[in-house]
């Protein structure tokens, strides 16, 4: 469950290390984002030679949340951290690698590139 001002780790090699959520896309009064949702973020920490610089505003898709995710079959899944993957303006990946597992809900929302690059889909 991601809301405004939530800090997220970055799960790709785009150069950003930490993001802060500014807005959740998809509805005027939408309060929370979960796995597979697109959010607008500010880059809080970045590598000095990365593609993304500190202070830049980017879009990202959430791939892991600490809050339990309720599946349709009754199962729950929970990750150790909140993490996202940085996107460009055309909603394509900036990085070329994904680190750590991602939730299956990313596939349902049409981000097949993330699913194919991820080492594990849970």
UniProtKB/Swiss-Prot annotation:
One Pfam family recorded for the sequence: Ribosomal_L14
Gene Ontology MF annotations: large ribosomal subunit rRNA binding; structural constituent of ribosome
Function of the molecule: Binds to 23S rRNA. Forms part of two intersubunit bridges in the 70S ribosome.
Cellular component, GO, one term: cytosolic large ribosomal subunit
Alphabetic keyword roster: Ribonucleoprotein, Ribosomal protein, RNA-binding, rRNA-binding
InterPro entries listed in its UniProt record: Ribosomal_uL14 (IPR000218), Ribosomal_uL14_bac-type (IPR005745), Ribosomal_uL14_CS (IPR019972), Ribosomal_uL14_sf (IPR036853)
The encoding gene: rplN
Family, similarity comment: Belongs to the universal ribosomal protein uL14 family.
One of the GO biological process terms: translation
Name of the protein in question: Large ribosomal subunit protein uL14
Quaternary structure and partners: Part of the 50S ribosomal subunit. Forms a cluster with proteins L3 and L19. In the 70S ribosome, L14 and L19 interact and together make contacts with the 16S rRNA in bridges B5 and B8.
Domain of life: Bacteria
Alphabetized CDD domains for the sequence: Ribosomal_uL14 (cd00337)
């Amino acid at each position: 469950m991601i809301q405004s001002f939530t800090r997220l780790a970055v799960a790709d090699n785009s150069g950003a290390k930490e993001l802060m959520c500014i807005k959740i896309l998809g509805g005027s009064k939408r309060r929370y984002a979960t796995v597979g949702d697109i959010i607008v973020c500010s880059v809080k920490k970045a590598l000095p030679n990365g593609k993304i610089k500190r202070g830049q505003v980017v879009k990202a898709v959430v791939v892991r949340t600490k809050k339990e995710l309720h599946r349709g079959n009754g199962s729950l899944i929970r990750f150790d951290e909140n993490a996202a993957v940085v996107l460009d303006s055309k909603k394509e990946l900036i990085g070329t690698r994904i680190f750590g597992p991602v939730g299956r809900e990313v596939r349902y929302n049409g981000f097949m590139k993330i699913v194919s690059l991820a080492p594990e889909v849970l």
